[in-house]
Amino acid sequence: MSPTRIYVDADACPVKDEIYKVAARHGLPVSVVAGNFIRVPADPSIERIAAGPGMDAADDWIAERAGPGDIVVTSDVPLASRCVKRGAEVLAPNGKPFSEASIGMTLAVRNLMTDLRSAGEVTGGPRGFSPRDRSAFLSALDTAIRRIQRSNKTA
């Protein structure tokens, strides 16, 4: 198994700075993936990936590489589903983990809300990102890293 890597679906990710700090503390490499150029700290453990044009280019890049022992940070539910199926730990920026048990219902709700929005039945979007979300994310990321490290020691 290759070393744990954190993959960040970077477009509109509000916790990139937190990811960089936690990854540095644990000595983990980070791949920051976006459709276009995105600014990242000058750190050899942080890899910037401009996946190129296309709505799903960044998602495809991450989904093709993430696997068991890796962590993916995304708010994109279809990407989360693909990565969970490949065995990666997946977290939303608010700290909510996506799992085999929860991803089916999460996808169904996402698709329902998309249909309701397109029919004009629902307006608006999710609530804003809060300090509580940031704190929950930091806790969830630390927990995921520790869980992977424990399983690597017993493997």
UniProtKB/Swiss-Prot annotation:
PANTHER family: UPF0178 PROTEIN YAII. HAMAP family: UPF0178. This is UPF0178 protein RPC_3085. It comes from the Bacteria. Pfam families: DUF188. CDD domains: PIN_YqxD-like. It comes from Rhodopseudomonas palustris (strain BisB18). Belongs to the UPF0178 family.
